């Protein structure tokens, strides 16, 4: 299911994937738009702001990492954002997910996040995809966006998304595991071939090299950025329960079971770390979207 929250824009809309028809939320005349985002214009320049307003970004996984990335996109005037997640907000999400409030428990994550985003930026067109990405539907859901933020922990789907994106030349940034870590200053962005201390990304990388023909030479880069932490993992004490499993609705036939957001997966987690993962991913995307076209850059 897909819902969209559009608002007036003078920018031509890019050709996006063929998503289902969407619900429209009309926004009132917004006279203070430039006051809202004047800080963005002063930072990135008028041309940079225009690029952000015209951009389309897809966030896959609206959990402890992806919800914060989506928040950053909205607060930086990105014009079109697609949110993809079939999960619903659970009490156990409260410690790390921005939309996890008392009156939101049980709601679809994409719906709660979309409503929040249009309150921040009434001109943002937010498309809600209440579904999981699978190897079978990823082209339909992801194709046509200017950038994709991978904030999921499904190894199979991560492999399929990254393999497809690299093969067809789609820009994507992938996020590693955010659980079991205390120090947000250890979070880094490097080429995906260079990550360390991240079992999730290591497993994905190994399969991409083995089954997708990605470079095995450690000196060769993949050309895809990854957000990860080089902090050694902190394991829970034996008497501590692992993560609750009340976050996962029954998957649709053919879909991957369980939630796809970067869950703690048995580790403890802190918003002081998970939020920084999302913000770092978003900041990398914003930098790429606002970079001047090399062909038109002054000599």
Predicted regions and their residues:
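E1/E1-like adenylate-forming module used to activate ubiquitin-like modifiers
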Residues: 2-3, 146-147, 152-272, 276
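Glycine-rich phosphate-binding loop and adjoining beta1-alpha1-beta2 segment
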Residues: 25, 78-121
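Alpha-helix C-terminal capping/helix-to-coil transition sites in glycosyltransferase folds
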Residues: 54, 141-144
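Conserved N-terminal Rossmann-fold NAD(P)-binding element of oxidoreductases
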Residues: 59-61, 84
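Hydrophobic/small residue at the entry helix of a nucleotide-binding pocket
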Residues: 65-66
